[in-house]
Amino acid sequence: MVNPLYHKHIISINDLCREELELVLRTAASLKSHPQPELLKHKVIASCFFEASTRTRLSFETSIHRLGASVVGFSDSSNTSLGKKGETLADTMSVISTYVDAIVMRHPQEGAARLATQFSGNVPVVNAGDGANQHPTQTLLDLFTIQETQGRLDNINIAMVGDLKYGRTVHSLTQALAKFNGNRFFFIAPDALAMPAYLLEMLAEKGIEYSLHESIEEVVPELDILYMTRVQKERLDPSEYANVKAQFVLRAADLNGAQDNLKVLHPLPRIDEITTDVDKTPYAYYFQQAGNGIFARQALLALVLNAELAL
């Protein structure tokens, strides 16, 4: 039976239904316990990073190598024809798609990944982040980590803290968890960085419970997952950044009264929104979360590039 993700573009987490999300997570769990070092042997995957990245790029490229595929690409678009000669994104994608079996792409412009799919022919495009819009593979590793630590993706109490306006990770994760049952959201952010109205409207339309809060401590005892984010300096003007950067900081003392199963997650990089004393608590799970990116991205690439996959 052909898997439903074969040759499918993965641009938004909304491109995947609940059953497809669960397929990716099952595949990720299988690859974590039973590596498949030749699964994508002879495949070539382009890693096209038009925006700076450390974890996402290295995680993708490690995933590609561990599946036996080859990787080509760039991590600095200023040295490409697009950056130096003014080539359009459309032409860049049209050419790259003739070289490779799949394209992994990060771009600072919202909608760029969707645009790329119009010029990639039959070559699937995987969005590694487009501006403040979507970051679907981060969401897949977040879901994998939540399931790994909680044993479920239904009936989760999750708080999202910090930059909820520009943070594409929280946008995608909110949309993904809304596909499951009984989840409850606690949003903790300064007014200037509040969760976008369209996401709150989506939750309300689905009858999903959410609430807005001014402090972390007031909700900690109710939580299964505490999802911290940094204030994104690169997306704010200096005066706005100075006003909000230290408004919500998690310290170990703030976790007094937490349930035993609570895990603190963060898409990283961490700046100063989680103090290092949290690292020593049993609740910290952000480094393991980052490591899970290998398995989530391996799973997605394996499914996108294999018509039939049974692990």
Swiss-Prot record:
Report the GO molecular function annotations: amino acid binding; aspartate carbamoyltransferase activity
What EC designation does it have?
A: 2.1.3.2
> ATP-binding: is it a keyword of this entry?
no
Q: What's one GO BP annotation on this UniProt entry?
A: amino acid metabolic process
Catalysed reaction(s)?
Answer: carbamoyl phosphate + L-aspartate = N-carbamoyl-L-aspartate + phosphate + H(+)
Which EC class is this protein assigned?
Answer: transferase
Keywords from UniProt, A to Z, are: Pyrimidine biosynthesis, Transferase
- Gene Ontology cellular component list: cytosol
Sequence positions that bind carbamoyl phosphate: 55-56, 106, 135, 138, 268-269
* Residues at which L-aspartate binds: 85, 168, 230
The pathway entry for this protein reads as:
Pyrimidine metabolism; UMP biosynthesis via de novo pathway; (S)-dihydroorotate from bicarbonate: step 2/3
Q: What does this protein do?
A: Catalyzes the condensation of carbamoyl phosphate and aspartate to form carbamoyl aspartate and inorganic phosphate, the committed step in the de novo pyrimidine nucleotide biosynthesis pathway.
Assembly state and interactors?
Heterododecamer (2C3:3R2) of six catalytic PyrB chains organized as two trimers (C3), and six regulatory PyrI chains organized as three dimers (R2).
What family is reported?
Answer: Belongs to the aspartate/ornithine carbamoyltransferase superfamily. ATCase family.
Q: Which HAMAP family match?
A: Asp_carb_tr
Q: What is this protein called?
A: Aspartate carbamoyltransferase catalytic subunit
Q: What is the lineage of its organism?
A: Bacteria, Pseudomonadati, Pseudomonadota, Gammaproteobacteria, Enterobacterales
Name the gene behind this protein: pyrB
